Amino acid sequence: MSRSSKRARQGKTKILISWGLLAIYALLAVFLLFLIFKYNMLAFRYLNIVVTVLIVALAILCFFLIRSKKVQNLTLILLLLGVLINGTSLFAVGQFIGFTSRLNATSNYSNYSMSVAVLADSPIDNISQVTSVMGPTGTDKDNIQQLMNDLKASQNKELTVEESSSYLAAYKSLLAGDTKAIILNSVFENIIESEYPDYASKIKKIYTKELTKTVETPKDVKGDSFNVYISGIDTYGPISSVSRSDVNIIMTVNRETKKILLTTTPRDSYVPIADGGNNQKDKLTHAGIYGVDASIHTLENLYGIDLNYYARLNFTSFLKLIDLLGGVDVYNDQEFTAHTNGKFYPVGNVHLDSEQALGFVRERYSLADGDRDRGRNQQKVIVAILQKLTSTEALKNYDSIIKGLQDSIQTNMPLETMMNLVNAQLESGGTYKINSQDLKGTGRMDLPSYAMPESSLYMMEISDSSLESVKAAINDVMEGK
């Protein structure tokens, strides 16, 4: 074979390879651009348009270079680079979408369980040995009925339910020997534990039914303002678990005026509890035991606003977030030693790592104003986190932050909305002005609790003037004042 024939054959081979690479490049480009525009990525300073033009321009250039049969080596190099860049970008975008999807994955439901329990030393070890149970059918009728229906369907077992005023009262009756078996709703267990820290070792569960509660879809945002409910639950483990909410902060955001207002409603605020609370008055933290919807509706009713989205994190995720941000800096206006971790917090600017931050936001017994001071400390840490999250450096590391939190934070904010916020921040630059406020009231020990009717609990009776002031401040930010 002559040298010219070899060159001709090599040239044809290169052209075929180039056409193949161009097809792969085009396919990757179509998927990449589809995702970029579907999820509104890079939509600041026309960067998404610039990326599109560059991708299309390279495809057109390579097409004509292949047709011309010239500079074949250069064409191959350009196509290989293009395929590599598109493939890597598509993988990164896919990973990012996967991470954010997992943030939303459990946002439409919450998990809890209903059980039949007996004393740990009871000879009863199977549901077939039980004929009657005690439980609060007056306050948790629907969940108890679901358990009874499941027992009938799966075990062909019908039980007589003796009425108790609460799960705590049922547990006390079990300890006293007045009943042999009780019903337990997992979301009420930490209420029992607050009075009987060793209760878990005193009982054994002989039957459990896992249940799921559906959460409402997000409310549409109109204009530049919206509200986010930030809930901190008082448990470790899966974020989808139903639990009391010890942190209740409404973040009011106005993108036009670049203002953020953080409103803390103390956990002990005495308010009508929506949904499962039947609009009966109780401390706000107990709304969380009926699901995140109950907390949202309770606060919406209290302040007369819509909460468009929610972000729910447990103390496990709180630790992760602080670690991912490299700690936070806050000003501490009173020295104290935390009961939870024994750490000392001096007056002045302090840098908090994850464990120190957790102690800082959980402490209330060593603070002059108790739970209200704790709420203010929570606001300080939230502000510090927001300032870091809205910094350019944090936005560059957005994917790693989301990856680290994907299993410990729950939000119903769609990816498109998240990207709109990121794009708006990158487009306009600057920083948000963050202010905070907290609802005030008077502490009392004589107010009845719907969830714990036998207990004498600390409640905060809300000040009417403080409530009106808080409402006005939220509306001012919403209206751009």
Per-segment meaning from a language model:
Residues 88-106:
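Hydrophobic alpha-helical transmembrane segments in integral membrane proteins
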Residues 15-64:
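Membrane-embedded alpha-helical segments of integral membrane proteins
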Residues 28-31, 61-64, 85-92, 439-441:
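Residue-level signal for alpha-helical transmembrane segments in multi-pass membrane proteins
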Residues 103-110, 118-120, 126, 131-481:
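Non-catalytic, solvent-exposed segments at the cell envelope interface
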Residues 71-94:
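Internal/C-terminal transmembrane anchor helices
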Residues 10-21, 64-79:
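N-terminal Sec-pathway targeting helices
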Residues 1-12:
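Terminal targeting segments of Actinobacterial cell-envelope proteins
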